[in-house]
């Protein structure tokens, strides 16, 4: 299933994408899409619904974050070997974990705000893993049983903030730095998350092109690893790192986002995002 939320910010309704790509209204069936709805029981109930029985949503409404109740926004750094190389950093021997503040979460096509002091604003197309059941000290073999589905994430990053110290969070957590969606695609449709093509264009020019097969640590490894250090709860999301092609890595001169730039990004089977960079308005 492809689950989503649509409508004005703060007034989103739950939706479902049918096999023809049409947006269907779920609001007469469920009030919202959150941890209960993406639990195994919740997804089983939703799977019984025939999309053709739901009203078609007219027009092209704004797409919101595809679900609510994100308690933790966990991120993995340098998880593609070529990206580590372009960043001038050693390939990690174990996953690098950091956090993005949940206040940075943004709709998939909403504007990205350039902070007033920003000088090195950058992009990162990533695969997001959405947790569906509590995971604590799980094995790699069982890890994906705790996953509800997958999303597109843009791990927007201010490199000047990020590299001021060994802690990356402040370069990753500004408001609007966490676009998620447009859909939460359940594991019945994404049976193997390690074969997904991914891309990011800047103003129509291809900057990133990769595939999740080149992750250093795959999705099962990441869920199992993170669960050794914190309990993962339904609704938590792990964003899994980015392939090469970020602005910081462009040679000979890095390229950073400026006001007016447009990012278009996506992953195979998970939909696309599009964001315009805008100035901070106070």
Feature map (PLM): residue ranges:
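Catalytic-pocket segment enriched in acidic/His residues
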Residues: 5, 9-10, 47, 53-56, ...
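Residue-level recognition of short, solvent-exposed, well-ordered loop/turn junctions
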Residues: 68, 122-124, 233, 258-259
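N-terminal non-catalytic cap/leader segment that marks the start of a structured domain
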Residues: 1-95, 262-264
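Structural signature of FAD isoalloxazine-binding scaffolds in flavoprotein oxidoreductases
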Residues: 90-108, 123, 257-269
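A structural-propensity feature for long, helix-poor, extended segments
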Residues: 107-128
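N-terminal accessory regions of nucleic-acid-interacting proteins
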Residues: 136-150
């Amino acid at each position: 299933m492809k689950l989503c939320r649509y409508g004005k910010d703060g007034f989103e309704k739950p939706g479902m994408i049918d096999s023809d790509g049409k947006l269907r209204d779920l609001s007469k069936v469920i009030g919202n899409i959150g941890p209960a709805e993406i639990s195994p029981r919740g997804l089983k109930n939703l799977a019984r619904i025939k999309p053709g029985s739901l009203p078609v949503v007219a027009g092209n409404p704004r797409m919101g974050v595809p679900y609510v109740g994100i308690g933790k926004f966990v991120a993995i750094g340098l998880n593609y070997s070529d990206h580590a190389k372009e960043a001038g950093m050693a390939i990690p021997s174990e996953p690098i974990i950091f956090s993005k503040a949940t206040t940075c979460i943004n709709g998939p096509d909403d504007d990205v705000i350039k902070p007033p002091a920003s000088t090195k604003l950058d992009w990162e197309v990533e695969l997001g893993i959405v947790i569906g059941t509590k995971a604590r000290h799980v094995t790699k073999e069982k890890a994906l049983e705790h996953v509800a589905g997958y999303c597109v994430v843009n791990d927007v990053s201010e490199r000047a903030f990020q590299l001021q110290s060994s802690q990356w969070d402040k370069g990753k957590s500004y408001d609007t730095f966490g676009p998620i969606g447009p859909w939460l695609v359940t594991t019945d449709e994404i049976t193997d998350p390690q074969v997904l093509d991914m891309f990011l264009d800047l103003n129509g020019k291809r900057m990133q092109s990769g595939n999740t097969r080149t992750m250093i640590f795959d999705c099962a490894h990441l869920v199992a690893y993170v669960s050794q250090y914190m309990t993962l709860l339904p609704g938590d999301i792990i964003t899994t790192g980015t392939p090469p092609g970020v602005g910081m890595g462009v040679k000979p001169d890095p390229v950073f986002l400026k006001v007016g730039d447009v990012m278009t990004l996506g992953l195979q089977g998970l939909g696309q995002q599009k964001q315009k960079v805008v100035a901070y308005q106070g």
